[in-house]
């Protein structure tokens, strides 16, 4: 469920979706949420290392990858910024905010939801012996892209 987007559709609610790997974004979100003169919701990504099959020392890396892959886009919805969603919704902090997927310039590697899924043991059953993703995983990637494109549209980026 897209809890942040659901909350943002309620009138006069400050909403942030952030991660511990993006400290400045998280700090800003927490400070603004506490200062907001109404209800605030701050959703912070946290991997469950044993259940997700992620090493104990990789929590920050995984949180960054969740954002980079569009699995968990960062956003801030601040009703004080204006009367329209475009004015209130801020996607700053996400990489390549105008693009569908983030591409690492040095390696030309595209980071997408499949990249994220490959990094977590819980998705291992969705890859065949040749490392090809299952139809379900490809559908999840398509859904993540649709969600990202909707956020871009709401924020007036596309």
Roles of regions detected by a PLM:
Residues 1-36:
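Conserved thiamine diphosphate
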Residues 29-158:
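Glycine/aspartate-rich loop-and-adjacent alpha/beta segment that forms the canonical ThDP
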């Amino acid at each position: 469920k897209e809890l942040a987007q659901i909350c943002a559709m309620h009138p006069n609610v400050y909403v942030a979706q952030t991660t511990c790997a993006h400290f400045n974004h998280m700090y800003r979100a927490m400070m603004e949420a506490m200062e907001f003169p109404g209800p605030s919701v701050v959703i912070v990504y946290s991997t469950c290392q044993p259940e997700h099959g992620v090493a104990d020392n990789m929590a920050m890396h995984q949180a960054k990858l969740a954002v980079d892959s569009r699995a968990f886009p960062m956003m801030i919805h601040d009703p004080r910024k204006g009367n329209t969603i475009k004015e209130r919704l801020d996607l700053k902090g996400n990489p390549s905010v105008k693009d569908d997927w983030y591409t690492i310039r040095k390696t030309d590697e595209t980071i997408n939801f499949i990249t994220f899924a490959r990094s977590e043991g819980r998705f291992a059953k969705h890859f065949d012996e040749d490392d090809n993703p299952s139809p379900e995983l490809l559908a999840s990637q398509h859904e993540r892209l649709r969600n990202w494109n909707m956020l871009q549209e709401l924020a007036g980026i596309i």
